[in-house]
Amino acid sequence: MFNVQRNMYDVQGNLREVLSRLPQGVRLVAISKYHPNEYIEAAYAEGQRTFGESHEQELRQKHETLPKDIRWHFIGHLQTNKVKYIAPYVTMIEAVDSLKLLREIDKQAAKNDRVIDVLLELHIAEEETKYGLTPDALRELMAGGEWRQLQHVRICGLMMMASYVDDEEQIRSEFRLAHSLFDEIKEHYFADAPYFCERSWGMSHDYEIAVEEGSTMVRIGTTIFGPRVY
């Protein structure tokens, strides 16, 4: 119990430190996957309300037991057959990488009589394990136009992960490419849509660079909660 209590104080101090580094207009998604409810409650007590999870079952369990005003973002790769389990309550699905997934989110949101905000995930990083749409695939999806018929999803922006490397210039160039793609999509398809405004990039190791390169939403876990408990 002593260790849990001590770590809860650490979480609160870490959260305050991160928030002090974020300029006005940049929002924090506290990535709480694999962390115990006590840590989320500690961050909640400090005023944090937006948390990110990447596993449907873990998210369901946390949603059932934690305060209902928490805004849950789903940040992981989401299988279409799992959408129905989170559709009733999820605030945003950040990692949409196919028209098929968009259709399923729309279908399940309609069943729950709500509109679900989503971000389209870009694949810019060099790692092969990263999911997401290549720049050309993103352009193709948008040009196809079927997304316009989906009444229960709202595309609010783009999300991406930079390469996990020490080369700051490479990281910066990937964020800049993401920003230019955001501007391109905004101009062509969402010029009159103020809700298309989110640029979700930047994690514990690169969020300060991400903010410099136009991020509006950073996803930070380890810096706040410490190493994950698997």
Feature names for model-found ranges:
Residues 2, 6-205, 213, 225:
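Conserved alpha/beta-domain cores
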Residues 215-230:
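Gly/Pro- and small hydrophobic-enriched strand-loop and loop-to-helix capping segments
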